[in-house]
């Protein structure tokens, strides 16, 4: 095709020939009305014109390309297909941001930086925004009852097949059996998606839904921030990356190193932060201790280098303000609270854009670190860097996008708060061999009181056989994954419950912490919902990720205790806060442009504007200790906001020699509304 010839000449930098082929291809696409094929042609023309220095012409082509992308995406009623489609077009958004920033450098007063931030927002979390918009209506109201019944049937079938898949994979099976069942699961998911799409198409209110509104820079400044809050939005690019720093009165941009360089450093920092988590390398206790000592020694240097890369250019602007972080790529794994506080030094290229478009250019430059994949420390002139964690001076809040925060505020502003304070689900039964099945009620009361002074257990130390292999194949392919009892969570629940009046608290422990309770609607009466249990991640099928609740009933019979993400989306949960105290609840499959497909999204869609999640597997006892401290600041005499309470609890933990390592306190982050 002509477009491929255009691309071939572009790679050879034969720009005139490339443009000619692309323009011929564009004329053909327009003459036959092939809008889908017009997308890559316009993208190619934008690249050619950028190389020729014709930036305004390049902008015309890339904007036209993205208008078609977003139009075609909007025609698909499946949120999953929308997100997948947009993921394939992320290079278009990256090109547009780079183009606008080049225009910005040439004319800093023309508002190009604002336009670049707007494009960054267009590229992010669009399916989550769509879902939040859909939450405004009852999608099943006024729809053919047969369609609704079919959806429920397929949901039950999917749950049954998911459980059957786990049972199969936990016993003896052939590769053919596993492949056949996986194909059936995939087919059922496709049928369920198709049924839901039909429900949307036939819903009287769905057609009237407008596309979710993306916030402008002016709206961010006016509605989402205050004088004590900054927005830091990262846009990672192949040649260079950008940091957009927004205050109520200004927009500043900083040029950062390329995506590959930042992501390599970020992944290394994440590995070092989570080094104490169980792993599959085995070895003697002495070998493990040696690995931890090596990680502890390397972490300060690597974290300092990451801080230099992504924070130091803007250090002079941070002060002691609250930081709203919109991360991208591997930066989503990083708890910014654990990074060292940068100090003012040589900043990156900076251009300030006032609230009314008045801009001033900074004179400093940024020297990026070495591109070596072995990640040596930068040979660039060292910036002054404090050893103090960012947490000490700043509340840190994570957002999928600024537009998501606006949507969450819009939805929660309309509703009445739930009448009661706190619901807690903790310490479920995971195995038929659990001692609580064998003891009398009085014995159970004595035997299940955990000793908070005893070391916690992790999956690596205590792996039950049933379901372990299933999760290995079905979820993360991690042979350390299992469901040991979290012995400190009952102590955690009891301590937290004491902080609110008894008639305002609901506790579901042991057998009562089950899936049926969550799906019954009972939790909608509570402003705070706290889960203290395991989670599981299905990287291949994100909708089948979820939370593990009681897998055994009081008669000792196995039951479905897996609360899956696709079920969380269907909850009606108008809570102010959901806390997921289990391991790795903030992780999930990354889809470009959408971010991590974690449990956070499901609970936001269900109605929670803020969710606390974890980034790695933390031992039972320190996790429970942190949660109790958090609730003391949240519900105790100080009555702090959720963001401030989490920060205060983490600072307190970090000053305890026993839990001073960031692994113990930095993994929990607040996602969503900061107020």
Task: Identify the role of each PLM range.
Residues 399, 404-535, 583:
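Cysteine-dependent hydrolase recognition
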Residues 1-9, 21, 28, 38-49, ...:
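TPR/Sel1-like alpha-solenoid repeat signature
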Residues 341-388:
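Intrinsic disorder/low-complexity segments
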Residues 491, 527-629, 633:
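Catalytic cores of nucleophile-dependent amide-cleaving enzymes
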Residues 55-343, 385-393, 398, 402-462:
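Amphipathic alpha-helical protein-protein interaction segments
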Residues 411-416, 421, 469, 622-675:
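An often Trp-containing, charged/polar helix-loop segment at the C-terminal end
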Residues 213-219, 291, 296-309, 476-544, ...:
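Functional beta-strand-loop-alpha-helix junction segments that form "active/interaction loops"
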């Amino acid at each position: 095709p002509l477009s491929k010839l255009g691309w071939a000449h572009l790679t050879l930098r034969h720009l005139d020939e490339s443009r000619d082929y692309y323009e011929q291809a564009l004329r053909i696409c327009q003459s036959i009305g092939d809008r889908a094929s017009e997308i890559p042609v316009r993208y190619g023309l934008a690249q050619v014109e950028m190389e020729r220095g014709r930036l305004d012409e390049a902008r015309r082509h890339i904007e036209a390309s993205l208008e078609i992308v977003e139009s075609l995406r909007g025609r698909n009623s499946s949120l999953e297909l929308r997100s997948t489609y947009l993921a394939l077009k992320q290079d278009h958004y990256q090109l547009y941001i780079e183009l606008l920033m080049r225009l910005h450098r040439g004319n800093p007063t023309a508002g190009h930086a604002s336009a670049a931030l707007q494009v960054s927002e267009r590229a992010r979390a669009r399916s989550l925004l769509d879902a939040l918009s859909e939450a405004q209506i009852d999608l099943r109201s006024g729809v053919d009852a047969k369609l609704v019944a079919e959806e429920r049937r397929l949901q039950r079938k999917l749950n049954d097949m998911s459980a059957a898949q786990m049972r199969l994979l936990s016993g003896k099976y052939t590769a053919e059996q596993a492949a056949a069942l996986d194909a059936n699961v995939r087919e059922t998911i496709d049928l369920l998606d198709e049924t839901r799409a039909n429900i949307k198409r036939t819903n009287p209110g769905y057609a009237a839904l407008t596309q979710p509104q993306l916030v402008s820079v002016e709206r961010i400044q006016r509605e989402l921030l205050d004088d004590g809050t900054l927005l830091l939005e990262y846009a990672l690019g192949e040649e260079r990356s950008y940091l957009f720093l927004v205050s109520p009165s200004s927009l500043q941009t900083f040029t950062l190193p390329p995506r590959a360089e930042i992501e390599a450093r970020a992944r290394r920092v994440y590995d070092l932060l989570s080094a104490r988590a169980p792993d599959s390398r085995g070895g003697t206790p002495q070998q493990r201790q040696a690995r931890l000592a090596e990680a502890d020694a390397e972490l300060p240097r690597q974290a300092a280098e990451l801080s230099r890369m992504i924070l130091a250019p803007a250090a002079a602007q941070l002060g002691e303000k609250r930081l709203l972080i919109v991360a991208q790529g591997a930066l989503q794994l990083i708890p910014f609270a654990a990074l060292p506080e940068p100090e003012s030094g040589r900043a990156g290229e900076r251009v300030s854009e006032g609230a009314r478009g008045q801009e001033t250019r900074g004179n400093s430059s940024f020297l990026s670190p070495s591109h070596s994949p072995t990640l040596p420390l930068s040979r660039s002139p060292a910036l002054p860097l404090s050893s103090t964690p960012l947490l000490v001076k700043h509340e840190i809040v994570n957002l999928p996008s600024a537009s998501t925060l606006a949507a969450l505020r819009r939805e929660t502003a309309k509703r009445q708060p739930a009448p009661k304070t706190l619901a807690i689900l903790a310490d479920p039964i995971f195995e038929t061999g659990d001692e609580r099945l064998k003891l009398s009620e009085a014995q159970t009361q004595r035997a299940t009181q955990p000793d908070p002074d005893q070391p916690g257990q992790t999956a690596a130390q205590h792996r039950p056989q049933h379901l372990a292999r299933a999760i290995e194949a079905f979820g993360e392919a991690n042979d350390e994954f299992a469901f040991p009892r979290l012995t400190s969570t009952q102590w955690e629940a009891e301590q937290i419950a004491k902080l609110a009046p008894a008639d305002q608290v609901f506790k579901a422990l042991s057998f009562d912490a089950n899936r049926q309770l969550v799906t019954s609607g009972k939790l909608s009466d509570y402003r705070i919902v706290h889960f203290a249990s395991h989670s599981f991640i299905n990287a291949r099928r994100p909708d089948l990720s979820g939370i593990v609740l009681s897998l055994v009933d009081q008669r000792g019979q196995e039951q479905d205790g897996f609360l899956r993400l696709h079920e969380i989306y269907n909850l009606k949960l108008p809570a102010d806060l959901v806390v997921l105290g289990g391991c790795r609840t903030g992780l999930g499959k990354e889809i470009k442009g959408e971010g991590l497909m974690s449990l956070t999204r499901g609970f936001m869609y269900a109605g929670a504007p803020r969710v606390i999640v974890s980034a790695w597997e933390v031992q039972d006892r320190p996790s429970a200790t942190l949660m109790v401290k958090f609730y003391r600041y949240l519900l105790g005499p100080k009555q702090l906001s959720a963001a401030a309470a989490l920060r205060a609890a983490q600072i307190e933990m970090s000053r305890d020699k026993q839990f001073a390592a960031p692994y113990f306190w930095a993994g929990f982050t607040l996602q969503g509304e900061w107020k």
